[in-house]
Amino acid sequence: MKPYLISDLEIISAGAEGKAIGKVDGLVVFVPFVVPGDVVDVEVYKKKKGYAEARLVAIKSYSPHRVDTQCPHFGLCGGCKWQALDYQQQLLYKQQQVEDNFAHLGKFDFPPLQPILASENIFYYRNKLEYTFSNLRWLDDEDMTLQKNGKTIEPRGLGFHIPGKFDKVLDIKHCALQEDPSNELRNRVKEYAIAQNLSFYNIRNHEGLLRNIVIRTSSTGEIMVIVVFTEKSEKTMSLMQFIKDEFPQITSLQYVINTKLNDSITDLEVHLYSGKDFIVDTMEDLTFKIGPVSFYQTNSQQAYRLYSIAREFAQISSEDVVYDLYTGTGTIANFVARQAKKVVGIEYVDAAIEDAKINSEYNKIKNTVFYAGDMKDVLNRDFICQNGTPNIVITDPPRAGMHATVIDRLLEMEPKRIVYISCNPATQARDITLLDAKYKVEKVQPVDMFPHTQHVENVALLVKR
């Protein structure tokens, strides 16, 4: 279709994927990087039955809920699409998202939602970021102007993928999501690599030495850096030595050789260059070892509050057998173990289960057991006979929710309480509907884990009827 202009579109709500919503002549228009209350001119570039997608052309009048953004890349980077929206308004829309999903997609009664738990830090809250090297840097308007005027533009960049452009990377100057030394480290590594003429990866033809850099931090002050190369060479090892020399505060410096077409490193060997091969984080009196490919909630401070809510909802006693479904690296299982008789954790990823066992051992917790495998296959009658019928189940499935077989097994086991943690209230509402015959929703607590994004976590307490 040929793009066309809509003038004076009033933005009335926040919608899916972090986009905002306007309406004109019965057509719903999705626009990124604007906020409810703005009046804007937009260019429609995609139109389907009942809705259209548009890009911002001009803001005609500003919403009272619009705030100044901290990020110099806002409007290009897709990471923090709600950053221009006042944080209290963000919370209202996230709360409404849970309410709407439960009301419209669920077929069950539920009590009034508890007020959403805000994040204490709305900037610099992430403990992990991954940046991509690319020799196809996204050129912004300023770059294009300089190029037209005959200036040579550096094509290499280190940053985040541009939304919708698989082969383009936005070169990041400053990211307000992770505390220092994240920004300084990323910028210094890029400068060194360019000065030494190290080749940046080209995702189209799969050439270039430098692929990714992962930076992990912890509440204890420890720092892990993992650099991903396509080969080990004198040049790549010189970069590792540069990082070690320039950033002595790094406690775990590692590298990976990845010659695959995709960026995943979970199935690859991680090589230790200096320091330890892990960092540690703490919650209460527990210490968690985090390896290079370990899953760990990226907002540590808010994760502690989320797990505290789950533990409070569960009301675990010393006689309770607890099943922790989709346990990941066993963080929740270990967090609640001291209140329980026994905790059984199940997770699909083998490496995560090994981390879970290590963390139990590290904290001298002896009443946990962990199993790896597909939940719908592992959680069978023989498994329950072997491990005991649970009194309490804590479940934290991926965005797709729980498999119908798992829900059927929950209905068979009939635990007295189910604590359902979800990063997708839509699939959570679907699953709770299937559990409604035997369980009523007693409490609902939304939690904001990711400020400036549309994502919301939700904890629901289900009690046996």
Where are these regions (language model features)?
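Rossmann-like S-adenosyl-L-methionine
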Residues: 2-8, 16-17, 233-465
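Short, aliphatic-rich beta-strand segments
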Residues: 215, 221-230, 287-291
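Short, solvent-exposed loop/turn elements at beta->coil junctions and helix N-caps
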Residues: 114-121, 203-204, 210-212, 446-449
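Extended interfacial segments that mediate partner engagement and assembly in macromolecular machines
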Residues: 58-69, 75-199
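Internal alpha/beta scaffold segment
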Residues: 167-203, 207-209, 217, 231-254
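Short, acidic/hydrophobic/Gly-rich beta-strand patch recurrent on exposed beta strands
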Residues: 20-25, 158-162, 228, 356
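Terminal RNA-binding accessory module
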Residues: 1-73, 369, 377
